[in-house]
Amino acid sequence: MNLNSIPAFDDNYIWVLNDEAGRCLIVDPGDAEPVLNAITANNWQPEAIFLTHHHHDHVGGVKELVEKFPQIVVYGPQETQDKGTTQVVKDGETAFVLGHEFSVITTPGHTLGHICYFSKPYLFCGDTLFSGGCGRLFEGTALQMYQSLKKLSALPDDTLVCCAHEYTLSNMKFALSIFPHDLSINDYYRKVKELRAKNQITLPVILKNERQINVFLRTEDIDLINGINEETLLQQPEERFAWLRSKKDRF
């Protein structure tokens, strides 16, 4: 399968997987127009849509795409049932698309019903995990998001993390404020800065590398523990995650 990214709005990415026959899967189409343009340019035949959560910048293009291609099956969590979903899926279930099984992983935090889709090596994680960061807590709790990230971090090393937003540069600036002397973070920040200066995408990322540079995946890191404890005593990793998320919100 071939992985494609379609820019939308200011910083969204709509991901598309296509097979050799031209059949395609569309993930979180917040806007129909760029997707329709890509379908025409590549002669794709849409088979399915995956929705991760109910926010408009992830579901706004569904209605128009389904009107144009009524054969499309729209998979999504319960919270997207009124956004065009025709097949509600939940944790532990699978969606069989393009000849591949995609596992559904529930990841509450950004929204209460947020889900991700995984078929090795592809992880479509919506607004749960970003490169260098994680989603804001609009509906869920810090504990829920911490547990969701633990699930995703446990996936295979070679997982390709397909995030829904180009937030990497700002996330890495925050990471540097936490770990100013970390070699991996400094190296990745320089790489990302160069890519964005050329208006190039920083995604997808390999999960093995992401674990090294994403402070939200490093809540049990001794350097982080020592650094945080200079300000406040936090004994549990989920407490350190909540502290980081709150600090990032104000960054």
UniProtKB/Swiss-Prot annotation:
Binding, Zn(2+) 1: H53, H55, H110, D127
CDD domains the record matches: hydroxyacylglutathione_hydrolase_MBL-fold (cd07723)
Catalytic activity: an S-(2-hydroxyacyl)glutathione + H2O = a 2-hydroxy carboxylate + glutathione + H(+)
GO molecular function: hydroxyacylglutathione hydrolase activity; metal ion binding
Pathway(s) this gene product operates in, as recorded in its UniProt entry: Secondary metabolite metabolism; methylglyoxal degradation; (R)-lactate from methylglyoxal: step 2/2
Function (record text): Thiolesterase that catalyzes the hydrolysis of S-D-lactoyl-glutathione to form glutathione and D-lactic acid.
Entry's EC annotation: 3.1.2.6
The organism of origin for this protein: Shigella flexneri
Family, per entry: Belongs to the metallo-beta-lactamase superfamily. Glyoxalase II family.
Cofactor-binding details, from the entry: Binds 2 Zn(2+) ions per subunit.
Any GO BP: methylglyoxal catabolic process to D-lactate via S-lactoyl-glutathione
Oligomeric and partner information: Monomer.
Top EC class, one word: hydrolase
SMART domains: Lactamase_B
Keywords recorded for this protein, A-Z: Hydrolase, Metal-binding, Zinc
Cofactor: Zn(2+)
Protein name: Hydroxyacylglutathione hydrolase
